[in-house]
Structure formats: structure tokens, C-alpha cells
Amino acid sequence: MSKRRVVVTGLGAVTPVGNNVQAFWESVKTGKIGIGEITRFDTADFKVKLAAEVKNFNAKDYMDFKAAKRMELFSQYAVAASKEAMADAGIEMEKEDPFRVGVIVGSGIGSLPAMEAANQRLIQRGPSKVDPLLVPKMISNMAAGNVSIALGARGKCTNVVTACASGTHCIGDAFRAIQYGDAEVMIAGGTEGAISPVGVAGFTNLTALSTSQDPYRASIPFDKERGGFVIGEGAGVVVLEELEHAKARGAKIYAEVVGYGATADAYHITSPIEDGSGAAHAMTDAMKEAGVQPEEIDYINAHGTGTHHNDLFETRAIKAALGDAAKKVKINSTKSMIGHLLGAAGGVEAVVCVKSIEEGFIHQTVGTKETEEELDLDYCIGGPTRQEVNYAMSNSLGFGGHNAVLLMKKYR
């Protein structure tokens, strides 16, 4: 069976620097930082004071009050981004076979805030007072479930939970679903809403988070002074569509998805493998599927978390996968502006790749000033780049050794 071609026809985003794609992208282009003091809880006893929170989000702008009350933030963000993406794609569900429209939207964590609130209620008021909707509000698959309900999409509906690689795996699996004829349209991406006392404390004690109190120097991927990531939240969603289906309805085509690689490190629960071989194989697999050579890759949106291990080992992976071409490719980290959106990161970064292809614009890695000796690639330090982007790659690496890579190209 020959694989069908898959294109991107819609984009949606809720982020710390903009609650829709236009606002988000304009912020990214100007290097706006979405990091600030945590407002969700009192951080007096916490080493970490900063996070990248979504601002001025009102769920009632996207759904009725009753629906909003039945969802936690991660589901609300997913529904908001998915509705934007579908409106952008111009898909009218009443004209589609709903069983040929699917959803794969993942969350790495689900709702920690719901669990924390329920635990407090259990301790203070007893088991009979725990919210009866706790379970359907907190479990991670409810992002996909709520998107399906909100849009009337009745095809394949799943979620992938691979920590910080969730969003990229979701888009990759949606790509496969269309390639092999399981759907005509897929709504895919990632979402997260885990800025909470337990979440921040857990990541802090893991020594994963930056303890800097300077928003402009807290998330500094590839910098020699990097000290961890800044936790963020939001959602990023793309509408993928079978090419002929998109052409038949006169859709605007942003880009084509041409490669997907997924591997495991089989090494450690939090650290990538030191030689970068797992991520390198995922990149190589994506290029092999697309039939492109390393020197054809114009841009890599790196996982680039700002932790010591990730940035060093990901650099090694890029060098292993691209060889001499690694020195020429433009590499950046969107996390320098919006922090690490965990399961949503890959979804939002896929949106960045598509916009970079569309506009020929590669944003800078904001805040990063000076790298160490082994980090000797072009990390887009000091300013953005305007150039044609024919091929863009997006890397995501998750706790547990999960690696996911998407390769997109300019549609012709």
C-alpha cells in the first residue's frame, strides 16, 4: 500500500506569550519573554519562583460555563487550541464524515492541580466530599476526549503519554493514521496545565528547574550558565489532512509532513543517553522516510530545555544525525521564551516550525549569550534569521527515554 501525502491546514495555540497563533507568533518574532513570578500559589517556601503561565485565559470564550466546569485547565487549553486550528483550516464538520475525522491530543501529566485539591478536601472534609468528577477531570486522555466532544470528531481518538515528547508523538501518530488511510483529517498536538505546588516541588527536588529569579536568564538553552528549565503551560494543535482531501475543498496548505521518527534510549528515567544515539536515530529515521539528506535540513527546533544534560546530549545527537551539515543548520529553542510546556511543547513547537516555513523566519534563542566548548553549533544567538526554510525538523525528548522527531517541508 502506498502512503498518502499529509499536509498541515490549520494551527491553534494557547501559550504564555499569546492565546492564539497570531499573538503567539508575533511575540515569538519579537523575542517576547513569557516567564514571570508564579501567581497560582504562594512560593515563599519554594526555591523556584518563576514559571511561564498562560495569561488572561477565559475558558468561557471557547465553551459554555457548564462545559468549562467539567474540565481542568489542560483540557480547556486543548479545546481552545483545537477550535482555533479547525476554524483556521476552514473545516465544517457538517460537511465531513465524522468517523473520518480523528483526534490525538496528549498531555504528559493530566491535572496535578485537581489531584492536589482533591487530596486537601479528602484530608479536611473526608472522602464523601471529594469531587465526583475528579477522575474524568484529571486523567490525561480527557484532553482528546473533550476535543472530540467539542468538535464532533468521531474517528480515531487517542492520546499519547510520553512526558515531554507527548505532543510530537501525537502529531506523528496522527500523520501515520492519515498516511495509511485510517482518517482524512486529524486534530493533533499536546496540552498541559501542571503549574502547581506539587508539580513545581517535584521538578525542583529533581534539580530539573532553573532557580534563577531573572526572567530573562532563567530559561537559557545551550548557554554555559544554564541551570534547568522553567515550567510552562498551554497547548499547541495542528490540523493534518490528506492532500487530495485538502485540495478538493480548496484549503490553504501551510506545509507538508514528510517524516516521523520515534525511538527509545533504554538508558535512564530522566537523562537522555549521553551519546545522543536515541534522538539521532529518530532524526535519521525521519530524514530517511522523507528521502532527504542532512544538508537539506534548513532548521531544527530543538528540544533545548536548558538543562545541562539535555542540551549537551541533544547537540551530540544532532551532530551524529547530520554529520558535517550540523555546523550549517539553524537551531533554536522556543523554550527560551515560553519555558517548557511539557506534554504541550511538541505541539507548540510544531506550530513554530510551520510558521517558520511559511514566513522564512527563524526566531532567536532569547536570553542565551555564550555556550561552552562542545556546544559549537548555530543556536541562533543574538537575533533572528530571515531565510527560506524548505525543511524544518522538530525534536522532542521525554523522561523515560522517549524520542520523537517530525520533519516538515514547504508544500509544492
Report each predicted region and the residues it spans.
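Active-site-proximal alpha-helical scaffold in enzymes
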Residues: A78-I91, S140-A144, S148-E192, V230-A251, ...
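Acyl-CoA/ACP chain-elongation machinery
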Residues: D182-G227, Y260-E274, G304-D311, K328-D378
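Conserved beta-ketoacyl condensing-enzyme motif
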Residues: V8, F24-W25, K29-T162, T191-V200, ...
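Glycine-/small-residue-rich "gating" segment that lines the acyl/pantetheine channel
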Residues: Q124-D131, H169-G172, R176, E192-A248, ...
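Phosphate/pyrophosphate-binding loops at sites that engage ATP/ADP/AMP, CoA/4′-phosphopantetheine
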Residues: A85-D97, A246-G250, M283-Y299, A321-A325
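A glycine- and small-aliphatic-rich helix-loop capping segment at beta-alpha/alpha-beta transitions
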Residues: Q22-S27, P113-P127, A177-Y180, V200-Q213, ...
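Condensing-enzyme catalytic core mediating Claisen C-C bond formation in acyl metabolism
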Residues: R5-T9, G36, D214-A290, Y299
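ACP-dependent fatty acid/polyketide chain-elongation machinery
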Residues: M1-A67, E244-E256, V351-T365, K409-R412
